[in-house]
């Protein structure tokens, strides 16, 4: 009788240096986390000892164990029987065999994998079960440069911080901020920036979260200046979303700052001041938006002593912004409290999607 490729021998005692990860492995096996992938992602490859999904699973375990690539499978996973046994594997495929399975994947396989990942997210996430009637769903959208070898798929020259002339790719991400859950990850070539990636990322998030028109009306999309153009914001508004963004145009930012007569010191940052307020949708200097927006001018003292100016744009009511930052919605009539709430709400991007990128790169 052929031995199954999963299901460790309960009579064998083993030890591992990855005890906490082994516990996670037992739990993931209980959840049958890879079930949708096993059922929905057929890979045209002959099975000798391990099925294609078995080999994908080995690659997944190796990544959880800290591997930076499939080349580390032999050293990190294959040499640790207790660890792969905890994940339900009786043995581990050799790294070159796992790589062959990756090479056998096609564009159709990628689409099938995305559908399977959607099924996994919906089955186990809080973001998918969010109650839109009780509160706002917050989605952060951002990009991060991922340097790589020049032979890697989609590798092109692009912008990578502190690494000039380095080939790489851009990772686009949508994060369900309240739950610290990655809703969508998509890989783009090294030249792609958020202004180009915004549309496919948002549409993918709509698919994963099953966002109909009513849910989109209760969803706040938060983006930086890379997608803060009038056309980008209007596209989101046309889809029915609320938006919190930083204006892409320095000309509009300078124009608004020149109109501010009362700059208020930011109590959280002594080098920053805030000013601004509601702007009608038909204000040509603000940009022709599809609905009334609030624009808050923010200036920060730079190292050369001059002011750096930015503008935060938001479609939320002040009471909603105050509530989202833990303030009192009754302060919505206070211009200073409202302006500060919008700025603080934008600042929280740094504790959301930007933090997830840093954690990914630090391991």
Locate the predicted segments by residue.
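Dynamic "connector" segments at or just before major functional cores
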Residues: 1-167, 171-193, 198-207, 211-214
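Short secondary-structure boundary/capping segments
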Residues: 153-158, 235-241, 258-263
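Domain-level cores of phosphate- or acyl-group-handling catalytic modules
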Residues: 194-254
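Flexible loop/turn segments at secondary-structure boundaries
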Residues: 83, 146-148, 181, 191-192, ...
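Short, glycine/acidic-rich beta->alpha junctions
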Residues: 53-54, 65, 225-228, 338-341
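Anionic group-transfer/hydrolysis microenvironments
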Residues: 117, 142-144, 224-226, 248, ...
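An anionic, glycine-rich sequence signature occurring as long contiguous blocks
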Residues: 2, 242-359
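Generic, well-ordered alpha-helical scaffold segments in large soluble proteins
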Residues: 76-80, 104, 201-208, 235, ...
